[in-house]
């Protein structure tokens, strides 16, 4: 939980207005990171995908934290929100081998899912 809170604080820096909350329920890590891929670019060819893979395959908590900090800085720069309650749960379950693979699978599925038209409209409306 501590890591999720510190990452939220990092993400929230510079966002002081009430509508600028970078915590968005229902936005998983994979989905948020996917929004960093430039429109029209294949996610598989993206530098974001390489960073995402490094995060998803990290085995040690310290390594996961390091990769997450870098990813959160990218999300902050692009003003892409993330669901921090889900991230806290994910970080908890990553500690256990039986559930870690499920967390990584969901992250990957969310990253590679084709965004719906509603997601694209919301993204254009909210993020530029």
Report residues per predicted region.
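Conserved binding-pocket/active-site segment within a compact domain
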Residues: 22-94
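Alpha-helical oligomerization segments
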Residues: 73-128
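Aromatic- and glycine-enriched beta-alpha-beta binding-site module
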Residues: 1-35
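Short linear sequence motifs
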Residues: 1-3, 45, 100, 104-105
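Generic hydrophobic, helix-prone segments enriched in Leu/Val/Ile
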Residues: 8, 64-68, 111
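Residue-level detector of solvent-exposed, low-hydrophobicity positions
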Residues: 9, 14-15, 36, 59, ...
């Amino acid at each position: 939980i501590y890591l999720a809170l510190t990452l939220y604080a990092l993400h929230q820096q510079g966002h002081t207005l009430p509508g600028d909350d970078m915590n968005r329920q229902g936005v998983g890590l994979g989905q948020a990171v996917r929004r960093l891929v430039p429109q029209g670019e294949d996610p598989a060819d993206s530098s974001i995908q390489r960073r995402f893979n490094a995060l998803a395959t990290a085995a040690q908590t310290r390594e996961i934290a390091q990769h997450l900090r870098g990813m959160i800085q990218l999300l902050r720069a692009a003003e892409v929100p993330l669901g921090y309650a889900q991230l806290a749960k994910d970080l908890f379950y990553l500690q256990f081998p039986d559930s870690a693979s499920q967390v990584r699978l969901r992250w990957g599925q969310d990253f590679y899912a084709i965004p719906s038209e509603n997601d694209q409209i919301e993204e254009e409306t909210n993020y530029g």
